[in-house]
Amino acid sequence: MSSRKKVRVLLLKNKTVPIDKYELECRSKAFEPIFVPLIKHTHVIQDFRNVLNTIPNYLNTINYIIITSQRTVESLNEAIIPTLTSEQKAALLSKTVYTVGPATANFIRRSGFINVKGGEDAGNGSILADIIIDDLSTDIKACPPSELLFLVGEIRRDIIPKKLHSKGIKVREVVTYKTEELSDGFKRFIHAMKECDEDEVFSDWVVVFSPQGTKEITQYLGDSNRLPGSHLRVASIGPTTKKYLDDNDVTSDVVSPKPDPKSLLDAIELYQRHK
Protein backbone atom coordinates (compact mmCIF):
# COMPACT_ATOMS: atom_id res chain seq x y z
CA MET A 1 0.00 0.00 0.00
CA SER A 2 1.25 3.44 -0.89
CA SER A 3 2.23 5.59 2.09
CA ARG A 4 1.39 8.76 0.20
CA LYS A 5 -1.30 10.71 1.96
CA LYS A 6 -4.32 11.69 -0.06
CA VAL A 7 -6.29 14.88 -0.39
CA ARG A 8 -9.95 14.11 -0.85
CA VAL A 9 -12.45 16.69 -2.07
CA LEU A 10 -16.08 16.05 -1.17
CA LEU A 11 -18.15 18.00 -3.68
CA LEU A 12 -21.67 18.60 -2.37
CA LYS A 13 -23.26 18.48 -5.80
CA ASN A 14 -24.63 16.17 -8.44
CA LYS A 15 -22.00 14.98 -10.87
CA THR A 16 -22.40 16.60 -14.28
CA VAL A 17 -22.55 14.12 -17.15
CA PRO A 18 -20.93 13.20 -19.42
CA ILE A 19 -18.04 15.38 -18.18
CA ASP A 20 -17.72 17.08 -14.83
CA LYS A 21 -15.00 19.72 -14.89
CA TYR A 22 -14.65 19.67 -11.11
CA GLU A 23 -13.67 16.01 -11.34
CA LEU A 24 -11.18 16.71 -14.14
CA GLU A 25 -9.61 19.60 -12.23
CA CYS A 26 -9.34 17.53 -9.04
CA ARG A 27 -7.60 14.68 -10.81
CA SER A 28 -5.22 17.07 -12.57
CA LYS A 29 -3.99 18.06 -9.10
CA ALA A 30 -3.91 14.46 -7.79
CA PHE A 31 -6.89 15.17 -5.52
CA GLU A 32 -9.55 12.49 -5.12
CA PRO A 33 -13.02 13.86 -6.01
CA ILE A 34 -16.08 12.42 -4.29
CA PHE A 35 -19.55 13.61 -5.29
CA VAL A 36 -22.24 13.78 -2.62
CA PRO A 37 -25.64 14.53 -4.22
CA LEU A 38 -27.98 16.43 -1.91
CA ILE A 39 -30.79 17.38 -4.28
CA LYS A 40 -32.54 16.08 -7.37
CA HIS A 41 -33.69 18.16 -10.32
CA THR A 42 -36.87 17.82 -12.34
CA HIS A 43 -37.51 19.60 -15.63
CA VAL A 44 -40.51 21.95 -15.76
CA ILE A 45 -41.78 22.87 -19.23
CA GLN A 46 -45.37 23.96 -18.64
CA ASP A 47 -44.58 27.55 -17.61
CA PHE A 48 -42.52 28.09 -20.76
CA ARG A 49 -45.22 26.53 -22.93
CA ASN A 50 -47.89 28.70 -21.28
CA VAL A 51 -45.97 31.86 -22.21
CA LEU A 52 -45.65 30.72 -25.83
CA ASN A 53 -49.32 29.73 -25.98
CA THR A 54 -50.76 32.87 -24.40
CA ILE A 55 -48.53 35.61 -25.87
CA PRO A 56 -48.60 35.61 -29.68
CA ASN A 57 -45.19 35.42 -31.32
CA TYR A 58 -43.55 35.87 -27.90
CA LEU A 59 -40.01 34.88 -28.88
CA ASN A 60 -39.96 37.61 -31.51
CA THR A 61 -40.98 40.27 -28.97
CA ILE A 62 -37.89 39.89 -26.76
CA ASN A 63 -34.19 40.38 -27.35
CA TYR A 64 -32.65 39.15 -24.09
CA ILE A 65 -32.67 36.06 -21.90
CA ILE A 66 -31.09 35.60 -18.46
CA ILE A 67 -29.85 32.14 -17.45
CA THR A 68 -27.88 31.67 -14.23
CA SER A 69 -28.01 27.89 -13.76
CA GLN A 70 -26.69 24.93 -15.71
CA ARG A 71 -29.87 23.12 -14.68
CA THR A 72 -31.86 25.60 -16.74
CA VAL A 73 -29.65 24.84 -19.75
CA GLU A 74 -30.20 21.11 -19.22
CA SER A 75 -33.96 21.69 -19.06
CA LEU A 76 -33.82 23.72 -22.28
CA ASN A 77 -31.79 21.08 -24.10
CA GLU A 78 -33.61 18.01 -22.83
CA ALA A 79 -37.22 19.12 -22.33
CA ILE A 80 -38.04 22.50 -23.87
CA ILE A 81 -36.17 22.92 -27.16
CA PRO A 82 -37.29 19.49 -28.47
CA THR A 83 -40.92 20.72 -28.25
CA LEU A 84 -40.31 23.89 -30.28
CA THR A 85 -40.93 24.36 -33.98
CA SER A 86 -37.88 25.05 -36.13
CA GLU A 87 -38.90 28.73 -36.28
CA GLN A 88 -39.27 28.96 -32.50
CA LYS A 89 -35.92 27.25 -31.96
CA ALA A 90 -34.17 29.64 -34.36
CA ALA A 91 -35.80 32.62 -32.63
CA LEU A 92 -34.77 31.36 -29.19
CA LEU A 93 -31.14 30.71 -30.14
CA SER A 94 -30.83 34.14 -31.74
CA LYS A 95 -31.33 35.94 -28.42
CA THR A 96 -28.58 37.56 -26.39
CA VAL A 97 -28.13 35.50 -23.22
CA TYR A 98 -26.75 36.93 -19.98
CA THR A 99 -25.28 34.43 -17.54
CA VAL A 100 -23.10 33.97 -14.45
CA GLY A 101 -19.74 32.20 -14.54
CA PRO A 102 -17.66 30.68 -17.37
CA ALA A 103 -18.94 27.11 -16.95
CA THR A 104 -22.57 28.04 -17.52
CA ALA A 105 -21.57 30.40 -20.35
CA ASN A 106 -19.73 27.57 -22.14
CA PHE A 107 -22.67 25.21 -21.63
CA ILE A 108 -25.02 27.80 -23.14
CA ARG A 109 -22.75 28.24 -26.18
CA ARG A 110 -22.60 24.47 -26.70
CA SER A 111 -26.41 24.50 -26.74
CA GLY A 112 -26.40 26.72 -29.82
CA PHE A 113 -26.66 30.25 -28.45
CA ILE A 114 -24.19 32.56 -30.17
CA ASN A 115 -24.32 35.85 -28.28
CA VAL A 116 -23.54 35.10 -24.62
CA LYS A 117 -22.60 37.89 -22.21
CA GLY A 118 -21.50 38.03 -18.59
CA GLY A 119 -19.94 34.63 -18.02
CA GLU A 120 -16.44 34.96 -16.61
CA ASP A 121 -16.99 38.71 -16.18
CA ALA A 122 -19.96 38.08 -13.89
CA GLY A 123 -19.06 36.17 -10.74
CA ASN A 124 -22.50 36.59 -9.17
CA GLY A 125 -26.02 37.80 -9.87
CA SER A 126 -25.44 41.31 -8.59
CA ILE A 127 -22.52 41.87 -10.99
CA LEU A 128 -24.52 40.38 -13.85
CA ALA A 129 -27.41 42.76 -13.14
CA ASP A 130 -24.99 45.69 -13.32
CA ILE A 131 -23.68 44.46 -16.69
CA ILE A 132 -27.23 44.17 -18.03
CA ILE A 133 -28.16 47.65 -16.80
CA ASP A 134 -25.04 49.12 -18.40
CA ASP A 135 -25.65 47.31 -21.70
CA LEU A 136 -29.31 48.21 -21.93
CA SER A 137 -28.64 51.86 -21.18
CA THR A 138 -26.71 52.09 -24.46
CA ASP A 139 -28.70 49.58 -26.55
CA ILE A 140 -31.16 51.33 -28.85
CA LYS A 141 -33.22 48.12 -29.07
CA ALA A 142 -33.87 48.38 -25.34
CA CYS A 143 -35.18 51.98 -25.30
CA PRO A 144 -37.65 51.96 -23.73
CA PRO A 145 -36.45 48.88 -21.80
CA SER A 146 -37.87 45.71 -23.31
CA GLU A 147 -38.91 42.73 -21.25
CA LEU A 148 -36.14 40.30 -20.33
CA LEU A 149 -36.95 36.61 -20.06
CA PHE A 150 -35.37 35.16 -16.91
CA LEU A 151 -35.33 31.34 -16.94
CA VAL A 152 -35.14 30.21 -13.33
CA GLY A 153 -35.46 27.36 -10.89
CA GLU A 154 -38.43 27.04 -8.57
CA ILE A 155 -36.16 28.21 -5.74
CA ARG A 156 -34.06 31.26 -6.63
CA ARG A 157 -32.71 34.52 -5.29
CA ASP A 158 -34.29 37.83 -6.26
CA ILE A 159 -31.11 39.91 -6.57
CA ILE A 160 -31.24 40.24 -10.36
CA PRO A 161 -34.97 41.09 -10.74
CA LYS A 162 -34.79 43.62 -7.88
CA LYS A 163 -31.84 45.47 -9.41
CA LEU A 164 -33.36 45.49 -12.87
CA HIS A 165 -36.79 46.56 -11.64
CA SER A 166 -35.17 49.47 -9.79
CA LYS A 167 -33.99 50.74 -13.18
CA GLY A 168 -37.37 50.29 -14.83
CA ILE A 169 -36.38 47.13 -16.67
CA LYS A 170 -39.16 44.57 -16.94
CA VAL A 171 -38.35 40.95 -16.13
CA ARG A 172 -40.53 37.92 -16.74
CA GLU A 173 -39.48 34.95 -14.60
CA VAL A 174 -40.31 31.52 -16.01
CA VAL A 175 -39.59 28.35 -14.03
CA THR A 176 -37.73 25.67 -16.00
CA TYR A 177 -36.80 23.21 -13.25
CA LYS A 178 -37.48 22.40 -9.64
CA THR A 179 -35.25 20.93 -6.99
CA GLU A 180 -36.01 18.66 -4.08
CA GLU A 181 -33.76 17.71 -1.21
CA LEU A 182 -32.78 14.05 -1.08
CA SER A 183 -33.99 12.49 2.16
CA ASP A 184 -30.73 10.55 2.55
CA GLY A 185 -28.37 13.43 1.71
CA PHE A 186 -26.84 13.68 5.18
CA LYS A 187 -26.49 9.91 5.36
CA ARG A 188 -24.57 9.97 2.07
CA PHE A 189 -22.31 12.69 3.42
CA ILE A 190 -21.53 10.82 6.65
CA HIS A 191 -20.85 7.63 4.69
CA ALA A 192 -18.36 9.50 2.50
CA MET A 193 -16.67 10.99 5.56
CA LYS A 194 -16.31 7.62 7.27
CA GLU A 195 -14.79 5.97 4.22
CA CYS A 196 -11.47 7.67 4.81
CA ASP A 197 -8.59 5.99 6.60
CA GLU A 198 -7.09 8.75 8.73
CA ASP A 199 -3.64 7.23 8.40
CA GLU A 200 -3.75 7.75 4.65
CA VAL A 201 -5.77 10.92 4.21
CA PHE A 202 -3.85 14.18 4.53
CA SER A 203 -7.03 16.21 4.55
CA ASP A 204 -10.68 16.13 3.59
CA TRP A 205 -12.16 19.15 1.86
CA VAL A 206 -15.89 19.72 1.87
CA VAL A 207 -16.98 22.06 -0.92
CA VAL A 208 -20.33 23.81 -0.39
CA PHE A 209 -22.03 25.10 -3.54
CA SER A 210 -25.48 26.03 -2.25
CA PRO A 211 -27.40 26.13 1.04
CA GLN A 212 -30.07 23.74 -0.21
CA GLY A 213 -29.93 20.34 1.43
CA THR A 214 -27.06 21.25 3.77
CA LYS A 215 -28.82 21.97 7.09
CA GLU A 216 -27.57 18.86 8.90
CA ILE A 217 -24.20 19.05 7.18
CA THR A 218 -23.59 22.62 8.36
CA GLN A 219 -24.41 21.50 11.90
CA TYR A 220 -21.83 18.74 11.51
CA LEU A 221 -19.26 21.17 10.08
CA GLY A 222 -19.92 23.84 12.72
CA ASP A 223 -16.84 25.36 14.34
CA SER A 224 -17.86 23.92 17.70
CA ASN A 225 -17.58 20.40 16.23
CA ARG A 226 -14.25 20.86 14.45
CA LEU A 227 -11.55 19.74 16.82
CA PRO A 228 -8.07 21.31 16.86
CA GLY A 229 -5.81 19.36 14.51
CA SER A 230 -8.75 18.06 12.49
CA HIS A 231 -7.99 17.12 8.87
CA LEU A 232 -11.36 18.55 7.82
CA ARG A 233 -11.41 21.75 5.76
CA VAL A 234 -14.31 23.70 4.23
CA ALA A 235 -14.41 25.56 0.92
CA SER A 236 -17.25 27.71 -0.38
CA ILE A 237 -17.88 28.39 -4.05
CA GLY A 238 -18.29 32.12 -3.53
CA PRO A 239 -19.15 34.99 -1.17
CA THR A 240 -22.89 34.26 -0.98
CA THR A 241 -22.25 30.69 0.13
CA LYS A 242 -19.55 31.92 2.54
CA LYS A 243 -22.09 34.24 4.18
CA TYR A 244 -24.52 31.35 4.57
CA LEU A 245 -21.80 29.28 6.24
CA ASP A 246 -20.75 32.21 8.45
CA ASP A 247 -24.36 32.59 9.57
CA ASN A 248 -24.35 28.92 10.56
CA ASP A 249 -21.09 29.03 12.53
CA VAL A 250 -19.02 27.34 9.82
CA THR A 251 -15.66 28.88 8.89
CA SER A 252 -14.67 28.70 5.23
CA ASP A 253 -10.97 27.86 5.00
CA VAL A 254 -11.12 28.79 1.32
CA VAL A 255 -13.49 30.94 -0.73
CA SER A 256 -13.20 30.43 -4.48
CA PRO A 257 -12.29 33.73 -6.21
CA LYS A 258 -14.60 32.75 -9.08
CA PRO A 259 -17.38 30.14 -9.25
CA ASP A 260 -15.51 27.74 -11.53
CA PRO A 261 -13.49 24.52 -11.09
CA LYS A 262 -10.02 25.95 -11.76
CA SER A 263 -10.40 28.90 -9.38
CA LEU A 264 -11.74 26.63 -6.64
CA LEU A 265 -9.11 23.91 -6.94
CA ASP A 266 -6.27 26.40 -7.37
CA ALA A 267 -7.34 28.02 -4.09
CA ILE A 268 -7.46 24.67 -2.32
CA GLU A 269 -4.06 23.70 -3.73
CA LEU A 270 -2.57 27.02 -2.57
CA TYR A 271 -3.97 26.47 0.92
CA GLN A 272 -2.50 22.95 1.03
CA ARG A 273 0.95 24.25 0.11
CA HIS A 274 1.03 26.83 2.87
CA LYS A 275 -0.55 24.89 5.71
Swiss-Prot record:
Keywords: Heme biosynthesis, Lyase, Porphyrin biosynthesis. GO terms for molecular function: uroporphyrinogen-III synthase activity. Pfam families: HEM4 (PF02602). GO terms for biological process: heme biosynthetic process; protoporphyrinogen IX biosynthetic process; uroporphyrinogen III biosynthetic process. Pathway: Porphyrin-containing compound metabolism; protoporphyrin-IX biosynthesis; coproporphyrinogen-III from 5-aminolevulinate: step 3/4. GO terms for cellular component: cytosol. Signal peptide: none annotated. The keyword Lyase applies. It catalyses: hydroxymethylbilane = uroporphyrinogen III + H2O. It is an enzyme of class 4 (lyase). Its EC number is 4.2.1.75. Belongs to the uroporphyrinogen-III synthase family. Present with 1360 molecules/cell in log phase SD medium. Catalyzes cyclization of the linear tetrapyrrole, hydroxymethylbilane, to the macrocyclic uroporphyrinogen III, the fourth step in the heme biosynthetic pathway. This is Uroporphyrinogen-III synthase. The lineage of its organism: Eukaryota, Fungi, Dikarya, Ascomycota, Saccharomycotina. The gene is HEM4.
